[in-house]
Design a protein with these regions (language model features):
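Acidic, metal-coordinating helix/loop segments flanking the phosphotransfer/catalytic sites
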Residues: 36-54
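Short, flexible helix-to-coil linker/hinge segments that flank and couple to helix-turn-helix
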Residues: 97-100, 109-146
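A short, hydrophobic beta-strand element within the central beta-sheet of small alpha/beta folds
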Residues: 81-91
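Conserved phosphotransfer cores of two-component systems
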Residues: 47-50, 75-81, 102
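Conserved phosphotransfer active-site motifs of two-component signaling proteins
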Residues: 61, 90-94
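Conserved acidic segment of CheY-like receiver
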Residues: 3-14, 19-23, 55
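Conserved phosphotransfer microenvironments
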Residues: 51-75
Length: 146
């Protein structure tokens, strides 16, 4: 099942436009909405009756908030069928180690080529989890080291 309705949560609005262009190359029905933070997504009445298939959480920060697992759980509670993709500028091996337990379905580096982002979308569409090439290489080479 292709994720048709996608929410991008990122401090940079252009990310949502880029994602829509990438995803529409494989799914012309893909519609991307944007908000600048997780708390807006959780609290806003705008999203009250929205059923997102995929939620992309982006960050330029070196680390995600410590309460990321709780935030992912809240997002999955509000948007029940949503898959969660982290779109990060920096590597955190703990995210990979805890992906299954925390409900994160994909972990992608922000500087991966467009083909890698498209591949992630296709893997999520197939019901699979995915770790992008850069992060997978870092994890297999360095494990829990930074």
């Amino acid at each position: 099942m292709n994720p048709d309705k996608i929410l991008v949560i990122d401090e940079m609005p252009i990310v949502s436009l880029a994602m829509q262009e990438i995803f529409r190359t494989v799914n012309t029905a893909a519609v991307v909405e944007y908000t600048d933070n997780i708390f807006t997504a959780l609290a806003s009445k705008v999203y009250e009756n929205s059923g997102f298939d995929l939620i992309i959480i982006g960050s330029q920060e070196d680390v995600f908030p410590e309460n990321l697992p709780e935030l992912v759980e809240e997002l999955k509670g509000r948007f029940r069928k949503a898959r969660i993709m982290l779109f990060a500028a920096s590597y955190n091996p703990a995210i990979i180690a805890e992906m299954d337990r925390s409900g994160i379905d994909a972990y992608v580096h922000k500087y991966e080529p467009l083909a890698e982002i498209r591949k992630t979308y296709l893997r999520l569409s197939a019901g699979e989890s995915y770790i992008s090439e850069i992060f997978r290489t870092l994890y297999s080479e360095y494990g829990m080291k930074k």
